[in-house]
């Protein structure tokens, strides 16, 4: 009001913008927030892919646990929970023979900043299943459509994998992040808490870049982030630029036969003029926790910056 009174704000110009004149465009007709369905557009337009043959094996692999489950690395059509964990163990061991492995899962807190988004994604009509290691494994869509079932599954996977890695006595680290604030590390048959990686945030999207940064601080020179999430991509670009990382950080999907990976260094170098503005651009045009304005999407926002 003060700025208006001294003619620092032109009201006529201000009300040309949708956010000022039509705040209801942030919401659907039923009152729910309007979350974007196409946030990956910004990643597809900006990422720089390179041949996987030109990249050496990593020192560290950071795996998005939720993405791994959605990708169904190994999901038995019929079987028990243990069968699923057997397949996940095989996948993790494909990295841990030559690299430290950080496996990061989402946490499911009530009334968190992500609650609305998760509620919109799940089917509230599906009942929760009670899971156990030797109990029957529900279908993938059933598990992944219930937060309660998914949380049980994550807890079982995290505990069972840590126990198995302890018996194998790998020389490389296996660090799993699940419900507890402090991740658990297993190495040389010993388990310990990684207090330095403590986090109270519920989103793996935030935790993954944090753990990448921790690995870089330990002088790791090559890091693979096995994840296809747009939020993670943008956060990695942001941290690479602002923290001036010198290590090689690459993103790849969950299939072993992919011929290309996304190079964060090359992406930042190509788009360094707009990297400082990407997080704000992404947020204002809609992300997991921020509704988007009608007809103002990623492409339109990027065209304003480029």
Region locations from a protein language model:
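Noncatalytic, typically N-terminal accessory segments of nucleic acid-processing enzymes
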Residues: 1-306
């Amino acid at each position: 009001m003060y700025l208006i009174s001294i003619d620092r704000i032109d009201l006529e110009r201000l009300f040309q913008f949708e956010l000022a004149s039509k705040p209801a465009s942030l919401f659907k007709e039923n009152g729910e927030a309007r979350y974007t369905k196409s946030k990956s557009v910004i990643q597809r337009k900006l990422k720089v892919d390179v041949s996987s043959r030109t990249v050496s094996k990593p020192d560290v692999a950071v795996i998005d646990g939720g993405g791994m489950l959605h990708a169904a690395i190994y999901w038995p059509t019929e079987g028990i929970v243990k069968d699923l964990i057997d397949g996940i163990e095989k996948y993790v061991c494909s990295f841990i023979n030559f690299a430290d492995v950080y496996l990061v899962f989402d946490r499911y807190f009530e009334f968190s900043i992500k609650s609305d988004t998760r509620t919109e994604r799940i089917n509230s009509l599906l009942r929760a299943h009670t899971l156990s290691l030797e109990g029957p494994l529900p279908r993938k869509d059933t598990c992944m459509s219930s937060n309660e079932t998914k949380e049980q599954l994550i807890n079982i996977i995290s505990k069972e994998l840590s126990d198995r890695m302890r018996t194998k006595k790998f020389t490389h680290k296996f660090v799993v992040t699940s419900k507890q604030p402090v991740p658990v590390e297993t190495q040389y048959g010993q388990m310990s808490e990684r207090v330095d990686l403590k986090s109270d945030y519920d989103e793996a999207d935030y935790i993954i870049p944090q753990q990448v940064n921790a690995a870089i601080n330990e002088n790791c020179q090559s890091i693979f982030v096995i994840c296809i999430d747009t939020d993670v991509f943008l956060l990695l670009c942001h941290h690479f630029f602002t923290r001036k990382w010198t290590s090689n950080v690459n993103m790849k999907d969950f299939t072993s036969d992919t011929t290309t990976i996304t190079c964060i260094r090359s992406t930042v170098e190509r788009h360094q003029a707009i990297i400082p503005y990407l997080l704000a651009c992404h947020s204002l045009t809609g992300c997991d926790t921020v509704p988007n304005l009608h007809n103002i999407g990623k492409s339109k926002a990027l065209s304003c910056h480029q």
